[in-house]
């Protein structure tokens, strides 16, 4: 069942990829039903808060009529960052399943483990579900981004002599 819902999260990650966003997708499931979906929209929304998990949690809370998601499992293609791990704790989500680890910002196992700290909620974690697919999508995105950035025109450096008299 975990692979089935991780595949749904990967569909959302691919949508983010196509829109020029870091390809992370998330679904929240209660029983056998998806109650929340989210994908990264930081560029589109011009917001540091527009992460896949935050979007999915907000939708699940609206759909279920409350902020406690006690009977839910969160599936996300990339290990949650500190902000998203905090949102998971606050929403009381009992189980988190993620695909790829995040060695730069992962707050579940890679960099730190917020779920093991002295908070009032400690989700169960399953990792590595469809990890290769999730990691490949992220690698392709960042490889394309590096090429794009390398080919962008650079700003011309202003020489100090050119700046004189412009006060």
Regions found by a protein language model. Name each.
Residues 49, 54, 58-91, 95:
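Helix-adjacent hinge/juxtasegments
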Residues 26, 65-66, 115-117:
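Short secondary-structure boundary/capping segments
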Residues 24-32:
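Short beta-strand scaffold segments in enzyme catalytic cores
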Residues 41-44:
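A short acidic/small-residue loop/turn micro-motif
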Residues 1-19, 83-167:
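Zinc-dependent deaminase
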Residues 4, 33, 55:
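Active-site phosphate/pyrophosphate-handling residues
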């Amino acid at each position: 069942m975990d692979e089935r819902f991780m595949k749904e999260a990967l569909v959302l990650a691919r949508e983010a990829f196509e829109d020029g966003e870091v390809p992370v997708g998330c679904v929240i499931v209660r029983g056998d039903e998806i109650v929340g979906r989210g994908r990264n929209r930081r560029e589109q929304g011009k917001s540091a808060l527009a992460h896949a998990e935050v979007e999915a949690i907000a939708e699940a809370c609206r759909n279920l009529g409350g902020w406690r998601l006690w009977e839910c499992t969160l599936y996300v293609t990339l290990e949650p960052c500190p902000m998203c791990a905090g949102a998971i704790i606050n929403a009381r989500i009992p189980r988190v399943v993620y695909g790829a680890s995040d060695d730069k910002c992962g707050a579940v196992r890679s960099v730190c483990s917020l779920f093991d700290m002295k908070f009032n909620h400690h989700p169960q974690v399953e990792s590595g579900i469809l990890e290769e697919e999730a990691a490949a999508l992220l690698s392709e995105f960042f490889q394309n981004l590096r090429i794009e950035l390398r080919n962008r025109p650079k700003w011309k450096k202003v020489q100090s002599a050119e700046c004189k008299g412009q006060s």
